[in-house]
Amino acid sequence: DARFAISANYTGKKGADASVGLLNDDNQEFFLTKVEYGSPSWQVSAAFASKTNGNTYDGYYHTSEGKDYSGKDLASIGLRAYWKPQETGVVPSVQVGFDMASVDEAADTNPDEMQAWMVGLGWNDLLIDGNKAGLAFGQRQHATSFKGGTKTKAYEEDNFVWEAYYTFKINDGVSVTPAIFGGEDLEADGHEVDGGVILTEFRF
C-alpha cells in the first residue's frame, strides 16, 4: 500500500557561537524538509532546502559556477520519482530527478539561478537470470542565469554526463561488472572525457 512521509532537518553553522546561537538572523542556517508518497514499487517526492547568510558548501556534483555563487540566501527545490515493474526482464525500472535553486541578492555577474537533472534506468535479470544492467544520464548542478546577464566560459555550464554498466553473475559469490562513462570536459570547450572500469565482487 502507498504511504505518506515527511521529514525535516535544521543545522546552524554558527550555533556554537554564544553571540549568535540558533534560529538567529546572524546565523548561517540550513533547513531541509522532504515530503514523499508512494509504495515499494513507485514513489514521488519533493524536497525544499534553504541556506541563509551566505552559507555555502563544497561538493563534487556541480560545475564551478554552480558552486561558486555569492549571495545572501539560497532556496532550492528537488523533485524525485521512481517506478519499478512487477516483473523483471526487458522492462526497466525508472528514476528521474530535477533540482532548481535561486540565489537572493546575488552579486553582479554571479549565478542567481541553477539547475540539475538526471534520468536512470535499471534492469534486473536482463537476458540471463541474476544479471543486471543500468544506464544513467543528466547534468550536474549548473548555472542557468547570471545577475546582469553576464556569463563567462559558457561551456562549463553546458555539461552532460552519462554512464552504463552490465553485471554478469558468475555464481552466487562472484560477479563481474564492466562499465563505461563519459561527459563534457569542463576545462576545455568541445572536449569530452570518457572512460571505463571493470568491477569484480566476491561475496563470502
Question: What feature does the model see in each segment?
Answer:
Residues 2-8, 16, 31, 40-46, ...:
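Repeated loop/turn-to-beta-strand initiation elements of outer-membrane beta-barrel proteins
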Residues 1-36, 160:
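Aromatic- and glycine-enriched pocket-lining scaffold segments that form the walls
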Residues 10-14, 39-41, 48-54, 98-104, ...:
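Transmembrane beta-strands of outer-membrane beta-barrel pores
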Residues 122-172:
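C-terminal hydrophobic structural anchor segments
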